[in-house]
Regions:
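Short, surface-exposed beta-edge/turn micro-motifs
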Residues: 71-72, 86-88
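Aromatic- and glycine-rich peptidoglycan recognition patches
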Residues: 1-4, 8, 50, 57-58, ...
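Conserved acidic residues
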Residues: 70-73, 123
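Catalytic cysteine-centered active-site loop
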Residues: 19-71, 79
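Short, positionally conserved secondary-structure boundary motifs
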Residues: 8-13, 41
Length: 130
């Protein structure tokens, strides 16, 4: 039963992320109505009762490194090719994530597996819910 409860936390994080699709994005916003990329991951984890760091750097350094991401895991990317993590999305399973692109856009769902943009930029996944 305990394992099921932990898995439910990952599912809850993913469901919360999906519920925020089409919410506006704004640099520095951590919800509940506007988000930046690390604000979205922070908010979704907090609604599942999980405390994670607020900053992207700290989020990428914490948690447990996961080889195969599941719903609720955080996905980290180097989108500018400088060898540094500069972006995070929330895995919702099946090779998909929810993320908050730059200010003035909307939170959206995207494939990060077999995707010409996201796949080469993907670096690792972290789990905070287990």
């Amino acid at each position: 039963m305990k394992g099921k409860t932990k898995k439910n936390k990952g599912k809850k994080i993913a469901e919360e992320a999906q519920s925020k699709i089409d919410s506006p994005t704004k640099m520095g916003a951590k919800g509940p109505f506007e988000f930046d990329n690390c604000g979205l991951s922070y908010y979704c984890c907090s609604t599942a009762g999980i405390t994670i760091p607020e900053s992207l750097k700290a989020q990428s350094e914490g948690g447990k490194l996961i080889e195969k991401a599941e719903a609720g895991d955080l996905l980290f990317f180097d989108t500018i090719g400088k060898g540094e993590i500069n972006y995070v999305g929330v895995c919702i399973g099946n090779g998909k994530m929810v993320h908050a692109p730059g200010s003035g856009k909307m939170v959206k769902e995207a494939e990060y597996v077999n995707n010409t943009y996201w796949t080469p930029k993907y670096k690792f996944a972290k789990r905070y819910w287990n």
